[in-house]
């Protein structure tokens, strides 16, 4: 409600990687791995969330699950996503549904792991597909090495994003680059970021940066301003 009062759009995001812990985080169960955690359990959560939030005017979309990966063979992500879509549409036929790709939603490997998502059916024809993209060598966003050590160039982001963006064009789908971010320790990262953002703009794909908020402290990807909100982080110059 506070966001709506300020005209701020909100994405409701279930940030569980298609897993759930029944023991306080010691172990995690995959959705579909057992009868204790099925696609219908996830669908029921979203049915209830949609019923609760559907009348707000600032819900940009329901992001049904962040970065699913290594799913159980008997319960592929595409099947789970379809069950959730069906459940949401029972109570909300208007709000966009955001579907993250498989394998950590990788933009670079979208075709290899997430091509089957194009078979999803939304009765309201209002799906948005979400990919994530980082510039380090292992695509993880941990940025354990330097710009040079990881062999990054000014076009690394564009080259990786093309796999996702071209897929969107090929199948006439809408997309969102829901995570991207760079360290604050080398200005060359900023050039790579800027080129990516120009490419996304030119292709009509919105994006959201990872990450912000006071809880991140000195995390090198964060864009939270310092000195009582008076000093911006370097990434904000892009």
Question: Where does each model-flagged region fall?
Answer:
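Hydrophobic beta-strand scaffold residues
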Residues: 10-12, 175, 207
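Extracellular glycoside hydrolase catalytic/binding regions
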Residues: 34, 40-61, 65-205, 221-233
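Short, solvent-exposed turn/loop segments enriched in Gly/Ser/Thr/Pro and often Arg
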Residues: 15-19, 101-103, 210-217
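Short, intrinsically disordered, charge-balanced linker/junction segments flanking boundaries
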Residues: 235-237
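Short secondary-structure boundary/hinge segments and terminal tails
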Residues: 21-22, 186, 217-218
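Substrate-binding cleft of extracellular glycoside hydrolase catalytic domains
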Residues: 1-53
């Amino acid at each position: 409600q506070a966001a709506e009062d300020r005209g701020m759009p909100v994405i409701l995001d279930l940030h569980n990687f298609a897993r759930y812990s029944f023991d306080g985080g010691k172990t995690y169960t995959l959705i579909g791995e057992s009868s204790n955690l099925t696609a219908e359990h996830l669908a029921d959560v979203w049915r209830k969330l949609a019923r609760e939030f559907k009348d707000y005017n600032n819900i940009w979309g329901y992001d049904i699950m962040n970065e699913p990966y290594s799913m159980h063979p008997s319960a592929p992500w595409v099947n789970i996503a379809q069950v959730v879509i069906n459940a949401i549409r029972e109570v909300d036929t208007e709000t966009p549904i955001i579907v993250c790709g498989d394998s950590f939603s990788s933009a670079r490997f979208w075709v290899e792991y997430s091509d089957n998502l194009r078979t999803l059916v939304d009765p309201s024809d209002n799906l948005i597909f979400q990919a994530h993209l980082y510039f380090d060598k292992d695509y993880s966003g941990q940025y354990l090495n330097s710009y040079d050590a990881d062999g990054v160039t000014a076009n690394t982001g564009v080259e990786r994003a093309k796999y996702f963006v071209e897929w969107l064009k090929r199948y006439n789908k809408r997309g969102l680059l829901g995570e991207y971010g760079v360290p604050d320790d080398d200005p060359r990262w900023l050039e790579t970021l800027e080129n990516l953002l120009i490419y996304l703009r030119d292709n009509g794909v919105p994006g959201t940066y990872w990450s912000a908020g006071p809880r991140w402290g000195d995390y090198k990807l964060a864009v939270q301003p310092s000195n009582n909100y008076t000093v911006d982080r370097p990434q904000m110059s892009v």
